[in-house]
Regions:
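Multi-pass alpha-helical transporter architecture, strongest
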Residues: 74-79, 160-173, 357-391, 398-400, ...
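C-terminal ends and interior cores of transmembrane alpha-helices
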Residues: 66-82, 268-280
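Hydrophobic core of transmembrane alpha-helices in multi-pass small-molecule transporters
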Residues: 3-4, 71, 84-104, 109, ...
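A membrane-interface helix-boundary motif in multi-pass transporters
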Residues: 57, 141-158, 340-365
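Helix-loop boundary and gating motifs at the non-cytosolic
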Residues: 1-39, 198-237
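Intracellular juxtamembrane helix-capping segments at the cytosolic ends
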Residues: 16, 99-115, 298-312
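Helix-to-loop junctions at the C-terminal end of transmembrane segments
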Residues: 42-56, 143, 245-259, 343-344
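Juxtamembrane intracellular "pre-TM" segments in multi-pass secondary transporters
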Residues: 169-204, 391, 398, 402-403
Length: 407
């Protein structure tokens, strides 16, 4: 399931930049990518609360898969038909609302079936990355890097995701007799998790790191093409190779290293990744693409495992949903609009000033690294915990309020 889900997501996001350019929709590109950010402010928390309290995550993902297939097909048709840009953006936003909760719901499904998430989640999550790569390669094999065919293929892939959900055992959903307030129905009570200082640092670091990272898919393909590298979707998938390697090795790292140093290493690789791209050469840019995957894993996947280990079972779908809001929502929205403005600032009459563009992003990641090293306390510290794993009230769905050491 993770494999096919990754393919469906990759077949839309990776070629989107070049597909919009090929159909004369370059002007809406920053807003098209920002649609994911807007959607992540709304749908992940709502569907996360639904999966925690009302419906099985498997059934939620099944419905989302069908909705994604329909929305992606409509959005692709509007791009191909060169409809009014506002209509195109509206349909892209509709698709974003359907796709934003999918990965956090899928992660919740997987975590619920693992005996040892630290050791097992990385390799299983790698299947999504393999699917992402396969989706990119299929797009390039179909010569659809700039074609609407990429979107139609992705829509069909979402239907395959739906089919896979019928092979999953539906686990019982934790029940609560408490009458839910409107903010609980919308999943806004997940914000309680931010009361824990270490939780807050992990959420904020992930969100801040997302801001410069959003430049990867809109602008790296453009730089690759300017350097004479065609089949950009396939070249971009190089980053997933190191992502997979890192995922298979992450379990061993979590046993030997503190979370603080794993995340710090990922952030440091993020600085190096953008610094290499700033050299403005084929080999250097490709080296930066390769490092992207390793950096991504050490920050984001570690954060997801942290949440599964430190958040009570009745809150885990909302915890993963809040992670989606902070990264896909807050981080992506600020990132796509901010890097779009930064890209325009770096534009010159003879072309983009790529060294300046990538160097600015490297500096931004360096600031995030410094913040994390200073603010995260970790092992040996005791803080007020929202939804901690030993919180009996949280396990019943009531507001959590416990003290627990955070590693």
């Amino acid at each position: 399931m993770f494999f096919v889900l990754g393919a469906a997501l990759g077949m839309w996001l990776v070629p989107l930049s070049t597909v919009l350019d090929a159909h004369g929709l370059h002007a809406i590109k920053p807003f098209a990518f920002a649609a994911n950010g807007l959607a992540a402010f709304v749908s992940p928390l709502i569907f996360g609360a639904l999966a925690d309290r009302r419906a099985s995550p498997v059934k939620v993902l099944r419905a989302l898969s069908v909705a994604n297939a329909a929305a992606m097909a409509l959005a692709t048709t509007s791009i191909q038909g060169r409809w009014n840009p506002w209509i195109v953006l509206g349909l892209i936003q509709l698709h974003a609302l359907c796709s934003s909760p999918a990965f956090s719901i899928a992660s919740t499904i997987v975590f619920a079936r693992l005996a040892d998430a630290k050791m097992e989640f990385g390799p299983i999550r790698a299947m999504a990355t393999l699917g992402w790569m396969a989706g990119c390669w299929l797009v390039s094999a179909l010569n659809a890097d700039q074609s609407a065919l990429a979107g139609y293929s992705g829509a069909v892939t979402w239907l395959v995701v739906c089919a896979f959900t019928f092979f999953l055992v539906v686990l019982p959903t934790p029940k609560s007799n408490k009458r839910l307030a409107w903010h609980e129905r919308l999943g806004l009570d997940a914000l309680t998790l931010l009361k824990n200082p270490d939780h807050r640092v992990v959420f904020l670091t992930s969100a801040l790191f997302t801001i410069p990272l959003t430049a990867f898919y809109p602008y790296t393909p453009v730089h690759l093409r300017e350097l004479g590298l065609a089949h950009t979707s396939a070249w971009m998938s190089l980053g997933q190779i190191t992502e997979i390697v890192a995922m298979f090795g992450l379990g061993a790292l979590l046993v030997k290293w503190r979370l603080k140093w794993i995340c710090a290493c990922g952030l440091g690789l993020g600085v190096l990744r953008f610094a290499l791209s700033a050299v403005n050469g084929k080999a250097w840019l490709l080296a930066g693409v390769v490092l992207h995957g390793c950096s991504y894993t050490l920050v984001y996947i570690t954060a997801q495992i942290y949440l599964d280990q430190r958040v009570a079972a009745a809150w885990r779908a909302r915890g993963q949903a809040l992670f989606s809001l902070m990264t896909s929502g807050l981080g992506n929205l600020i990132g796509y609009l901010g890097t779009g403005a930064w890209f325009a600032t770096c534009a010159r009459p003879l072309g983009t000033h790529w060294p300046l563009f990538w160097s600015g992003l490297a500096a931004a990641v360096a600031v995030v690294l410094v913040y994390f090293l200073i603010a995260y306390h970790g092992r040996g510290k005791r803080f007020l915990t929202a939804g901690s794993t030993d919180d009996s009230s949280a396990s019943s769905g009531d507001p959590p309020n416990a003290i627990q050491p955070i590693q």
